[in-house]
């Protein structure tokens, strides 16, 4: 290998020597196993490495400052001094005597790194370097290296390597005394081999001479001893070195045996050290000052543990702790101690014990982290202290009973409202938890006492207090127990404790609470109390379900009182709307919008609102009519829209929607024909809501009514153009609404005696209309007509907006001054009831254009009427409202009958559709299918009549073999 290559290799090895020390050591081990390339001298024998047996050491190995001591033993080397310099000096002197015959001065070496020199006659031989790390045990023997001098005597790691060119070693040397080797740090500076190899022109000659000498010499391979420091004690490992003669049969060995006599601790060191430690422990236990430095005590424990005295040390420590704890038990067996004083005494003992064990553990920390940690069966020093305290203090039956009873007594006092020392409770319960007896010794009794206390309290307070007050008390108790859990109870008790309180104060009284106070809370709309009720019931298993059932029963009962009582018909719909708003608010605010309560409310409304068939539907229709009629000043357009939305919610619950349709259509016709509709937009909005809810078929006729009104406007435009070409006397303006009979309600025709001017105008319009639409028939509905009259009174002229019947009555007074009831009836032909309502509106209302004699609110037979010339009013145009015709029983029955007729048609159609599809069906299945298709309730008797009617009309027949089965007839 060239000089530049060797220099480069040395530089790289110097840079990486620290990081790759372990890798270098591994490479050297492999090199030893494989053996070096065959040199011209005899092969090297592999060294023997016995397992390391660290000797006992009392003092620590000195550092680099002992470098000079090694030099005095082995001149020309750098290293640490041996613990036994006399033996090492003798060994070195003996080696020198064998090698002083022909040795030259060793070149200066670096203080950090040594180099071994060897000669080779082959031109391919290369220099090899070895780095040794003082921190790891060296197991690789040093390899021979080239040297610049022809003959050298060098030392490898504190061991001399002898070379001789004349006299072979005949004597077998043994080191019988103790010998300790010190390793050299691989970071030491590398000696400059390149300068030594090139310093003399005779380097090649010297190398040849050295090779010649090596042929007749034996090489001593020295082993490396490295010092390991662990826990302050020095451990050394040695290897055996051997000589190998260059000639077979003349090999001599230098055997260095392992240490026979290891350094021992001074006599009585263990006893004296333990005595110091014992005194320190007793001082801690007695709360007196410690004579020794804590660091010194810690070091003493470390020294004892390092010399395998850990087991005995642990036993002694346990014994002294146990003796001290046993001595504490007598103070707790006094019967005269008060429970609180006893608890304070046991707490003080526990606190002292914890403080003592912390200090003791800090001194014996090395023992705790080495010996105890390696023995899994042994408890740590802290756990040992807990075991001893539990075994000798708390496990004492008298002490434990008195402790638990005292704790329970303090908790009971606090529950009764007394002030207690909560920090004392927290400390004692923490002690029980640390000693792992909390659940077995305390928690079970604590929960039993809790159940007993709250069971009695619940029974007592349920009888004495009202529901709102009781609910607040329960909530307060739950908050108190939660605070105890946070303050001094263990968190493992939380679930059991809260469940116990909830069960005794709530779970055992769910039904009683609801039966006693739910109705009053709902009636009085006590939102906060209802919220608390729901919150508490949600904590108990099954509580919400019980509350839900009572909620349903309340809605059904309260709603039934609204619907069933006929006296409340006038206010039924408004009360239903108010009740619905109330329960919605309770659900949103108190029940947190629970879907179960929402669905239960809907089912309850549907149940009670249909207990009275047809009537709710009729009243809802009339209520809508009152809100959509002109003159309603109760709400703005936005409020009217919201009100209609609420009505539609109630409308969803009723079964008889066809009844609603019949009455709604009747009222809508009046609003459209008489012009009493408050807003066309509101009318169409309501129609849109009905269509969305019930479908297009439900509103088809209602939509047709609006279309007729639009077409009538177009026809009247054409009629006015037609009237311009007609020679009609007078200045009467006629407006006619053309209605399709199928869309509008059925009205009973009433023949009346119209004035001749009106009759003439009717004929003109009839001629005009039939001329455009041949084949059609007009039927006049005089009950729906209205007029505008101009009247003159003493105060002045007025315009009167009146119905057709009112117009006919007022026009009679152009012919006379006074008329009786019979005379007016005969002249106008108006039906008696209608005439009485007409006269009542003219003579008994707010705008009294007629005067009645005798005076009174009702129209009686024999009454006479005269024109009130003294009539006064601040308005020019006055609308005289006709007395609202109260629907008689016959008229209501007529409307209901029409609804029933429509239902019959729907039932017949449903039966035919089902039989046509199924062909053959039993009676029960047919009835079930019909119920599923119909949208209104049907009595079984009515359904049976419809089946018999279809059989009579040959739509279906009974099966001849099975009378309970029907067959469809195609």
UniProtKB/Swiss-Prot annotation:
<feature type="modified residue" description="Phosphoserine">
    <location>
        <position position="154"/>
    </location>
</feature>
<feature type="compositionally biased region" description="Low complexity">
    <location>
        <begin position="192"/>
        <end position="211"/>
    </location>
</feature>
<feature type="compositionally biased region" description="Low complexity">
    <location>
        <begin position="117"/>
        <end position="126"/>
    </location>
</feature>
<dbReference type="InterPro" id="IPR016157">
    <property type="entry name" value="Cullin_CS"/>
</dbReference>
<feature type="compositionally biased region" description="Polar residues">
    <location>
        <begin position="146"/>
        <end position="155"/>
    </location>
</feature>
<comment type="pathway">
    <text>Protein modification; protein ubiquitination.</text>
</comment>
<comment type="subunit">
    <text>Component of multiple DCX (DDB1-CUL4-X-box) E3 ubiquitin-protein ligase complexes that seem to be formed of DDB1, CUL4A or CUL4B, RBX1 and a variable substrate recognition component which seems to belong to a protein family described as DCAF (Ddb1- and Cul4-associated factor) or CDW (CUL4-DDB1-associated WD40-repeat) proteins. Component of the DCX(DTL) complex with the putative substrate recognition component DTL. Component of the DCX(DDB2) complex with the putative substrate recognition component DDB2.</text>
</comment>
<dbReference type="InterPro" id="IPR016158">
    <property type="entry name" value="Cullin_homology"/>
</dbReference>
<feature type="modified residue" description="Phosphoserine">
    <location>
        <position position="110"/>
    </location>
</feature>
<dbReference type="Pfam" id="PF10557">
    <property type="entry name" value="Cullin_Nedd8"/>
</dbReference>
<dbReference type="GO" id="GO:0006511">
    <property type="term" value="P:ubiquitin-dependent protein catabolic process"/>
</dbReference>
<dbReference type="GO" id="GO:1900087">
    <property type="term" value="P:positive regulation of G1/S transition of mitotic cell cycle"/>
</dbReference>
<keyword id="KW-0234">DNA repair</keyword>
<feature type="modified residue" description="Phosphothreonine">
    <location>
        <position position="202"/>
    </location>
</feature>
<dbReference type="GO" id="GO:0010498">
    <property type="term" value="P:proteasomal protein catabolic process"/>
</dbReference>
<keyword id="KW-0539">Nucleus</keyword>
<dbReference type="InterPro" id="IPR001373">
    <property type="entry name" value="Cullin_N"/>
</dbReference>
<keyword id="KW-0131">Cell cycle</keyword>
<protein>
    <recommendedName>
        <fullName>Cullin-4B</fullName>
    </recommendedName>
</protein>
<feature type="compositionally biased region" description="Low complexity">
    <location>
        <begin position="78"/>
        <end position="98"/>
    </location>
</feature>
<feature type="compositionally biased region" description="Pro residues">
    <location>
        <begin position="36"/>
        <end position="57"/>
    </location>
</feature>
<feature type="cross-link" description="Glycyl lysine isopeptide (Lys-Gly) (interchain with G-Cter in ubiquitin)">
    <location>
        <position position="247"/>
    </location>
</feature>
<dbReference type="GO" id="GO:0070914">
    <property type="term" value="P:UV-damage excision repair"/>
</dbReference>
<dbReference type="GO" id="GO:0010467">
    <property type="term" value="P:gene expression"/>
</dbReference>
<dbReference type="GO" id="GO:0048708">
    <property type="term" value="P:astrocyte differentiation"/>
</dbReference>
<dbReference type="InterPro" id="IPR045093">
    <property type="entry name" value="Cullin"/>
</dbReference>
<feature type="domain" description="Cullin neddylation">
    <location>
        <begin position="902"/>
        <end position="962"/>
    </location>
</feature>
<feature type="modified residue" description="Phosphothreonine">
    <location>
        <position position="106"/>
    </location>
</feature>
<dbReference type="InterPro" id="IPR036388">
    <property type="entry name" value="WH-like_DNA-bd_sf"/>
</dbReference>
<dbReference type="GO" id="GO:0031464">
    <property type="term" value="C:Cul4A-RING E3 ubiquitin ligase complex"/>
</dbReference>
<feature type="compositionally biased region" description="Polar residues">
    <location>
        <begin position="99"/>
        <end position="109"/>
    </location>
</feature>
<keyword id="KW-0597">Phosphoprotein</keyword>
<dbReference type="InterPro" id="IPR036390">
    <property type="entry name" value="WH_DNA-bd_sf"/>
</dbReference>
<dbReference type="GO" id="GO:0000209">
    <property type="term" value="P:protein polyubiquitination"/>
</dbReference>
<feature type="compositionally biased region" description="Basic and acidic residues">
    <location>
        <begin position="1"/>
        <end position="14"/>
    </location>
</feature>
<dbReference type="InterPro" id="IPR016159">
    <property type="entry name" value="Cullin_repeat-like_dom_sf"/>
</dbReference>
<feature type="short sequence motif" description="Nuclear localization signal">
    <location>
        <begin position="112"/>
        <end position="115"/>
    </location>
</feature>
<dbReference type="GO" id="GO:0005829">
    <property type="term" value="C:cytosol"/>
</dbReference>
<feature type="modified residue" description="Phosphoserine">
    <location>
        <position position="250"/>
    </location>
</feature>
<feature type="region of interest" description="Disordered">
    <location>
        <begin position="1"/>
        <end position="157"/>
    </location>
</feature>
<dbReference type="Pfam" id="PF00888">
    <property type="entry name" value="Cullin"/>
</dbReference>
<keyword id="KW-0963">Cytoplasm</keyword>
